[in-house]
Amino acid sequence: MDLIPACDRTMSSSCLVAELVSIAPNTTVGLPSGIPMATRSLILLVCLLLMVWSHSEKKTIPGPSFCLGLGPLMSYLRFIWTGIGTASNYYNNKYGDIVRVWINGEETLILSRASAVHHVLKNRKYTSRFGSKQGLSCIGMNEKGIIFNNNVALWKKIRTYFTKALTGPNLQQTVEVCVTSTQTHLDNLSSLSYVDVLGFLRCTVVDISNRLFLGVPVDEKELLQKIHKYFDTWQTVLIKPDIYFKFSWIHQRHKTAAQELQDAIESLVERKRKEMEQAEKLDNINFTAELIFAQGHGELSAENVRQCVLEMVIAAPDTLSISLFFMLLLLKQNPHVELQLLQEIDTIVGDSQLQNQDLQKLQVLESFINECLRFHPVVDFTMRRALFDDIIDGHRVQKGTNIILNTGRMHRTEFFHKANEFSLENFQKNTPRRYFQPFGSGPRACVGRHIAMVMMKSILVTLLSQYSVCPHEGLTLDCLPQTNNLSQQPVEHHQEADHLSMTFLPRQRGIWESPSPF
């Protein structure tokens, strides 16, 4: 899809100098005798200036050729057609770890070099993201919420509410909520032979999010259907051109899908508001309650409250739950790792319920989770925009340049001893943060990174201490059809529902061999 950069073949200044100088073996001889000495000196001076200029030019960034505008068009079409993640991997594999492409006519850099990625993540010049304003407006994210809010001042203000809810004292209750919710959903399984694992994990995670951050009764399956449609709309409209939104008949279906979830969340927020008004005493001020108070004090609009609750609710079902799904597949593909993990769980947790103090002791589990996030992450890139001119690894970056940080590829190319293998040896030693960025770092790092680790550990321990999870024959990570647009997702079709299911076989503590599903 990319053009051979033949259109870029122009004579460089150094070539011009070489041609001028090579007219004769001695530059003071060989010129026509009629040319005065002053003219000869001027020619030599120009040649020297051209040589200096050619060596002081900024580094050129590799990438597809511009070629009369066809290069930007073709690279943009690749992103639209194959997805952001897939296209980013394609260009890094083809051109290297720093690549220049175009998205919707805007210059975009794709970075998978650790030093460049670290520079962008830590630098406040890149606290904004890029995306279609009309697309973000369609899903309610334009200058609202936290995920793609590019109003930096408002984003900083809103982030404080998320930080309070996702860190500190609120983390203490997370383990108990996760264990209770996971156990409840395990007890409610109608069959252990054909478990819809993705559905089980999504329902569990939505329930946990509701208990921690909202606190009102919800229909989990109905809400999950709306979340799925919203996510599909999100990745469909994020980088679409403005002309796409000129024709309502084209994007109306996606706009309706986004509105359905927004209306559902608004209804839940209103229910929470009424409960607060009717309560004699408010013992538990959770995330949604804090936002409602902020709205009452004029600090946040009703639309922002709705969007913040929406983003808190959707953050886990299509990221954390799918991460857990990938982890279960990798666990069964690496039985020696499963053995280590079960031995650790039985030794540290035993017959008791998981406690907060157990988490730090589960070192094998932590290495396993980190290796899964490195080897096959759900979200393997992040999007930024340069707010000021800058230099990244010697390359000049102009204000307004789009940046894609391809951390998934970075994790496979630098530092790790067995970068292309799934191995816990990759985390035997402490890994410098700049080489391992599953949640990002710096001012715009994932605010939920700590609670995400607690949730994953709690769910895995509760599940694996009771059941051996057995994917059906042929279900492996390599054979699993996947897409990679905003995130890596398994392709789900109704006719393939059984193929994605697994069998849960009861296990006894202290017995570490997987029982046969037959």
Swiss-Prot record:
The keyword Heme applies. Its EC number is 1.14.14.14. It is a peripheral membrane protein. It is found in: Membrane. One of its GO terms (molecular function) is aromatase activity. Its cofactor is heme. One of its GO terms (cellular component) is membrane. Pfam families: p450 (PF00067). Heme binds at residue 446. It catalyses: testosterone + 3 reduced [NADPH--hemoprotein reductase] + 3 O2 = 17beta-estradiol + formate + 3 oxidized [NADPH--hemoprotein reductase] + 4 H2O + 4 H(+); androst-4-ene-3,17-dione + 3 reduced [NADPH--hemoprotein reductase] + 3 O2 = estrone + formate + 3 oxidized [NADPH--hemoprotein reductase] + 4 H2O + 4 H(+). GO terms for biological process: female gonad development; lipid metabolic process; response to estradiol. Keywords: Heme, Iron, Lipid metabolism, Membrane, Metal-binding, Monooxygenase, Oxidoreductase. Catalyzes the formation of aromatic C18 estrogens from C19 androgens. Belongs to the cytochrome P450 family. This is Aromatase. The lineage of its organism: Eukaryota, Metazoa, Chordata, Craniata, Vertebrata. The gene is cyp19a1.
